[in-house]
């Protein structure tokens, strides 16, 4: 009997404690919901395109498109009607623009980005980059050596593959080399453009994509990585690093960047390309340039490059890497950019003064040419 009374007492005490914990001394007040934020650490932003010193579009994963009109102090989210990843965006003027992305996604706006219409790209391949020299003419690149072009603002597309064909007896072995992924395009007008991608591919056209020429051959004598015991000499020119981004300021001057932190440059339209020196900081001694040598410590991949303002340039990459073009043609780590431990996917300047850097959970804005940067919280 005593044991039952003790058990009853314990149960009663527990109920009292639960009641007190639930009710407390005051009436419970409903907490307001947390505000919805346009920028979170889980966001993956892939590209940015400014249309004025303070107005810019930013695109990313899960169909996310943001617009700021006040230099990143506030953002408006634009519903584009898809959850597909958006990898690239370009506005050709204040009203007209295009974006591209996952599963053949191509969309167009004609009202300044308020609404977006999906275009029939006739492909389900990923489209990683685009370049529109004007509102009607554009070029898009992607998986399996895909290049698409339009001359009517996306009403129709011409598709082709920039592939290298090998003899039938080695076609199975050569399959990964025949259709490399193309990541980036840069056109300075409707005729002259460049495309870069996997395995060091560089292609150029001077007639609006009617024909293309490979340009990476000038890099091969500079590349000092020897063939391995199982490497086939017929694939020697595929040992170059993958290039993720290319930027041309005119028909002569361009740069590209990619794996292992390499930057290449040309001042003759790509007839010759050269690997660029790098430095730990502005004014520091340059590295010993041995392209292809194993880097210790390893250098971060570079995902984007932008030539702007006549003679300036920046490049961004993994774990917050930011390089700045120096007067001597070398690239140095830029200490003015806040340390960010996340990938920085894209740098883009509107002019020599106003620019943006976007990446994973990160949007940065400068209005003094990159001397200082401001985090945009949205």
Residue spans of the language-model regions?
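Bacterial N-terminal signal peptides that target proteins for export
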Residues: 2-14
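Bacterial N-terminal signal peptides
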Residues: 12-22
């Amino acid at each position: 009997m005593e044991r039952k009374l003790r058990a009853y007492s314990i149960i009663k005490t527990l109920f009292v404690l639960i009641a007190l914990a639930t009710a407390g001394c005051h009436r419970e007040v409903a907490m307001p919901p947390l505000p919805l934020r346009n920028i979170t650490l889980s966001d993956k932003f892939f590209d940015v395109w400014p249309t004025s010193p303070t107005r810019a579009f930013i695109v990313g994963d899960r169909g996310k498109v943001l617009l700021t009109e006040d230099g990143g102090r506030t953002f408006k989210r634009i519903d584009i009607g898809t959850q597909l990843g958006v990898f690239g965006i370009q506005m050709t003027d204040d009203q007209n623009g295009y974006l591209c992305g996952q599963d053949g996604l191509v969309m167009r706006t004609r009202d300044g980005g308020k609404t977006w219409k999906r275009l029939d790209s006739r492909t389900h391949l990923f489209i990683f980059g685009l370049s529109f020299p004007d509102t009607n003419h554009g070029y898009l690149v992607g998986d399996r050596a895909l290049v698409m072009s339009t001359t009517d603002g996306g009403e129709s597309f011409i598709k082709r593959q920039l592939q290298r064909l090998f003899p039938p007896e080695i076609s199975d072995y050569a399959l990964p080399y025949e259709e490399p992924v193309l990541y980036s395009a840069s056109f300075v007008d409707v005729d002259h453009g460049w495309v870069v991608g996997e395995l060091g591919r560089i292609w150029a056209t001077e007639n609006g994509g009617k024909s293309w020429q490979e340009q990476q051959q000038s890099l091969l004598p500079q590349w000092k990585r020897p063939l391995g015991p199982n490497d086939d000499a017929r694939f020697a020119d595929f040992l170059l690093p993958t290039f993720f981004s290319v930027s041309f300021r005119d028909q002569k001057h361009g740069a590209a960047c990619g794996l292992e932190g390499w930057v290449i440059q040309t001042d003759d339209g790509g007839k010759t390309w050269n690997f660029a020196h790098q430095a730990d900081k502005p004014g520091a001694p340059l590295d010993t340039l041995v392209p292809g040598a194993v880097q210790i410590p390893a250098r971060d991949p570079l995902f984007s490059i932008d030539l702007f303002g006549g003679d300036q340039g920046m490049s961004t990459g993994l774990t917050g890497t930011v390089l700045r073009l120096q007067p001597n043609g070398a690239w140095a780590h830029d200490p003015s950019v806040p340390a960010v431990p996340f990938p920085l996917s894209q740098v883009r300047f509107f002019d020599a003064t106003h620019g943006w850097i976007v990446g994973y959970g990160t949007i940065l804005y400068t209005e003094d040419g990159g001397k200082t940067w401001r985090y945009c919280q949205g």
